[in-house]
Amino acid sequence: KFLQLAKTEPKCDGVLVLIDADEDCAANLAKELAARAEKLRLPFPVAVVCAKCEYEAWFLASLETIRGSCDIPDDAKFEGNVEEIQGVKGWLTRQMPKGKIYRETHHQVRMTELLDPTRVRMRSRSFRRLEHAIQELINGEITVSPR
C-alpha cells in the first residue's frame, strides 16, 4: 500500500523498504518483496532490505557506542552473532533498570543516532546490504533491488 501511495507523490525519486526479517530468510523475503514491487511498474526505483532478524540487532553490533545511554548500563555486553539472536527488544529490556522497557517509539531513534556504522558494517551482513541499497538508490542504478 505504501508503494502505491508513493506512486502518487510527484517528487518521489525512490523508495527504501526496510523491514525486520524476523524468522524468515532475509534474502528470500527481500527477493519476494522486490518481485511484488516490480509487478507494480513504479516510476521510481525501489530497494528492499530485510534486517536479520531485527533492526535492533544493529544496536547490538554497536553496543559499545550505545551503552551508557538510552537506559542501557555502561557495562552491558553482548557476545554472539548479532544476526542470529531472536528477541533483541527483550534482550535490550533485560539490560535496562527494573521497571524500564525498550520501546521503539522512545529508544529507536536515539539508539540509531548512536550507531557506529563501521562497527555495524563489520558485524552485520544485513547492514552492509542496507548501505549497498542506499548507494544503489543514490546512483540511480536500479529499478528494483534485489533481483
Where is each model-derived feature located?
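C-terminal accessory helical subdomains adjacent to catalytic cores in phosphodiester-
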Residues: 2-147
